[in-house]
Amino acid sequence: MKKISFIFIFFLFSSSLLANDNKKEIDKLFVQLKSALNFENSKKIEDKIWDLWTTHPSRNNLTKLLADGSSAMMDNKLDAAYDKFTEVIELDPNWAEAWNKRATVLYLMGKYELSQADIDKVLKIEKRHFGALTGQGLVQTALKNYQKAIDSYIEAHKVHPFM
């Protein structure tokens, strides 16, 4: 029993360390993004941020599920994508990118209010998520809330000057 408890505690501790390393790296990249001198530089930094966002910090199976959902979404299999993203959210409700992907698929399904609810979850977890901020602009435009859409795009631009 002691061995099982030790393994469980070790797993929780190491997962926490990986998440902290991930956050530190993302924080560093956002500093670099704000000071990028041109679009090409910003794009390289943005790609690194997306790589970190779409890779679960400690659970490879969730990264794979997210990728499977993304593939389904790209193939216009929106119900299958929605199910994959929901499964990821159920397994880790604190992973912003799972909420962001589901918000995207909900937008593509025309379920704008539900998409906005998921975007709210993303931004609660990661307020600098420029993908969610621009997605929010699209959702608010679809809902004819034009000032909210403009505000979302302005916020995205503050976070990502070359967006």
Please provide the spans of the model-predicted regions.
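Register position in tetratricopeptide repeats
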Residues: 55, 74, 108, 142-143
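Helix-start (N-cap) detector for alpha-helical repeat units in TPR-like alpha-solenoids
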Residues: 62, 96-97, 130-131
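Canonical positions in the second alpha-helix
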Residues: 88, 121-122, 155-156
